């Protein structure tokens, strides 16, 4: 299936000079959404994943169906202050400033095989921070999966030690 046909290009969003890749049309098309979910599921199954992790918010959209399909848990990675129990937090640099992500301390058990799923691989900063959270808790990151990869931003280089799967490249 040509998943690119289900991605809308929106010029000058969220600011002038940006070409935003809108995944909403894919999510609205049941067959395309199922196809993407099935591709992620097969990747996670091939990695023998015990747990799926997804950064907020769109990592939830693609990660949860995979966890359900495999009968494994899903652990959400959130912005600080959004998780109600004890959590670990990692800060990372952005082009202009920094950001932080958190994960419940009991979300990942030592030795668990984890696949992390998100919608977009751009610079790789969010995914690198998510990997760091999982590994801090003793998880083994066996794969990273993305709906879209923006090749020019070279985020894959930051993640070179991991098996990366993308469904759409721009």
UniProtKB/Swiss-Prot annotation:
SUPFAM superfamilies, per database record: PRTase-like
CDD domains for this protein: PRTases_typeI
Membrane-spanning intervals of the chain: none
EC number: 2.4.2.7
Subcellular location: Cytoplasm
Higher taxonomy: Bacteria, Bacillati, Mycoplasmatota, Mollicutes, Acholeplasmatales
Organism the protein comes from: Acholeplasma laidlawii (strain PG-8A)
Family, similarity comment: Belongs to the purine/pyrimidine phosphoribosyltransferase family.
Assembly, per entry: Homodimer.
Name listed for the protein in its UniProt record: Adenine phosphoribosyltransferase
GO molecular function: adenine binding; adenine phosphoribosyltransferase activity; AMP binding
Stored NCBIfam families: apt, PRK02304.1-2, PRK02304.1-3, PRK02304.1-5
GO CC, any one term: cytoplasm
Superkingdom assignment: Bacteria
Role, per record: Catalyzes a salvage reaction resulting in the formation of AMP, that is energically less costly than de novo synthesis.
Alphabetical keyword list: Cytoplasm, Glycosyltransferase, Purine salvage, Transferase
EC class of the enzyme, as a word: transferase
Catalytic reaction annotation: AMP + diphosphate = 5-phospho-alpha-D-ribose 1-diphosphate + adenine
């Amino acid at each position: 299936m040509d998943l690119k046909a289900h991605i809308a290009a929106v010029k000058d969003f969220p600011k002038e000079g940006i070409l935003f890749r809108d995944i909403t049309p894919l999510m609205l098309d049941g067959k395309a959404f199922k196809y993407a979910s099935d591709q992620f599921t097969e990747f996670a199954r091939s990695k023998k994943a015990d747990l799926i992790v997804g950064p907020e918010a769109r990592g939830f959209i693609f990660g949860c169906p995979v966890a359900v399909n495999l009968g494994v848990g899903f652990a959400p990675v959130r912005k600080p202050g959004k998780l109600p129990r004890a959590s670990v937090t990692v800060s990372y640099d952005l082009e202009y400033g920094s950001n932080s992500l958190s994960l419940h301390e009991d979300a990942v058990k030592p030795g668990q095989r984890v696949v992390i799923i998100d919608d977009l691989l751009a610079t790789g900063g969010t995914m690198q921070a998510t990997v760091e959270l999982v590994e801090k808790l003793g998880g083994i990151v066996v794969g990273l999966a993305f709906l879209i990869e923006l090749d020019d931003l070279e985020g894959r280089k930051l993640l070179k030690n991991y098996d990366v799967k993308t469904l759409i490249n721009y």
